[in-house]
């Protein structure tokens, strides 16, 4: 039995060190050289302070800010998850209807799908252009800005599909909110 156990344990230890330590460290080192900002989490800095990440969404609920998609994890990056409610769930339907009513009351516009449904991770940093445009009037009122100026700012932050082919156009919520704050209104 020992003749089989010793090589098996040695293989387990060697592969554990290789795949659990050496490989992740090598990839982290390569990433730090090739793309240091991405290896560090794509952090966004303002005046030397981290204000967010380009990859992880965060909640904004003030009337003068662009609101993100709903988050099942309450914007907790340590515990990302979806609601796990099935498409035929009465609880999910009630949740979506509640979000829809709140969105339409806040914005005076019909709610796009991404405004009432959480993403799979619960931390999506983007909304659809339709969602962002529907919020423009509320943002302009709250900040005392011309609605056309807010719409121009939103349009300036629309990101096209990757290579024009994959995915959908999207708007980075944090980028728009930082631009709104920088505009001084």
From Swiss-Prot:
Xref: HAMAP family: KdpC (MF_00276)
Bilayer topology: Single-pass membrane protein
Quaternary structure, from the entry: The system is composed of three essential subunits: KdpA, KdpB and KdpC.
Pfam families in the cross-refs: KdpC
Protein name in UniProt: Potassium-transporting ATPase KdpC subunit
GO cellular component: plasma membrane
GO molecular function: ATP binding; P-type potassium transmembrane transporter activity
Localization of this protein: Cell inner membrane
Domain of life: Bacteria
Listed NCBIfam families: kdpC (TIGR00681), PRK00315.1 (NF001454)
Biological function: Part of the high-affinity ATP-driven potassium transport (or Kdp) system, which catalyzes the hydrolysis of ATP coupled with the electrogenic transport of potassium into the cytoplasm. This subunit acts as a catalytic chaperone that increases the ATP-binding affinity of the ATP-hydrolyzing subunit KdpB by the formation of a transient KdpB/KdpC/ATP ternary complex.
Metal-binding listed as a keyword: no
Source organism of this protein record: Cereibacter sphaeroides (strain ATCC 17023 / DSM 158 / JCM 6121 / CCUG 31486 / LMG 2827 / NBRC 12203 / NCIMB 8253 / ATH 2.4.1.) (Rhodobacter sphaeroides)
Chief subcellular location: membrane
UniProt KW keywords: ATP-binding, Cell inner membrane, Cell membrane, Ion transport, Membrane, Nucleotide-binding, Potassium, Potassium transport, Transmembrane, Transmembrane helix, Transport
Leader sequence segment: none
Name of the coding gene: kdpC
